């Protein structure tokens, strides 16, 4: 098997910009490993495709609001994406900006509409490879993320950057079994499970 076996063209107009009304209404492609036959189902059909004793492994990390909008002291806009929380007050991040902020400078994180509401000053301590190391003030990285951050949707999901994130996006980009905070991206295969489907699968065990 070669990695190239999985290469395919995906037209942009076929990429769903919003989820199905019901999580389990998403489409499911099934490949029979013995015959090579491909069949198409809906995710709600999953229980009919698994057997007693099959092992299913779930990633129960919870996506944090890891994307911030902000600006440099000069006024230039930037976007910050948390990559790794080092401790309560320090984090490694990606910064998207026309010009990178300098080590020792301060950036302001705030609302995406640029109105300057609830802005928080964050210190740029320096570079760490491809990332920047930031120091956050009290109450710390995760608390500030909850106050000012957004759930980082994938780049192929188009949203107006000037509009605050909807509560629907924030809820649907979490699995129903998410518990442990820390992920900056959802384990997307798990987004199609709902509580009813999980209960049905548990009964088959």
Spans of features found by a protein language model:
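Short polybasic amphipathic segments
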Residues: 26-31, 107
């Amino acid at each position: 098997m070669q990695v190239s076996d999985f290469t395919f063209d995906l037209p942009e107009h076929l990429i769903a910009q919003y989820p199905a009304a019901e999580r389990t209404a998403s489409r499911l492609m099934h490949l029979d490993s013995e015959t090579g036959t491909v069949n198409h189902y809906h995710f709600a059909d999953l229980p009919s495709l698994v057997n007693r004793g099959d092992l299913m492994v779930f990633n129960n990390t919870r996506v944090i609001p890891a994307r911030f909008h902000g600006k440099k002291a000069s006024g230039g806009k930037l976007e910050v994406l948390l990559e790794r929380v080092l401790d309560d007050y320090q984090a490694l991040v990606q910064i998207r900006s026309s010009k990178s902020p300098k080590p020792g400078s301060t950036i302001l994180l705030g609302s995406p509409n640029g109105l300057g509401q609830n802005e928080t000053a964050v210190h740029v301590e320096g570079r760490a490879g491809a990332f920047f190391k930031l120091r956050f003030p009290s109450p710390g990285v995760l608390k500030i993320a909850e106050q000012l951050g957004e759930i980082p949707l994938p780049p192929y999901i188009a949203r107006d950057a000037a509009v605050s994130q909807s509560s629907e996006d924030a809820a649907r980009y979490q699995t129903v079994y998410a518990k442990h905070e820390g992920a900056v991206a959802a384990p997307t295969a798990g987004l199609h499970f709902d509580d009813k489907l999980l209960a049905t699968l548990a009964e088959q065990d």
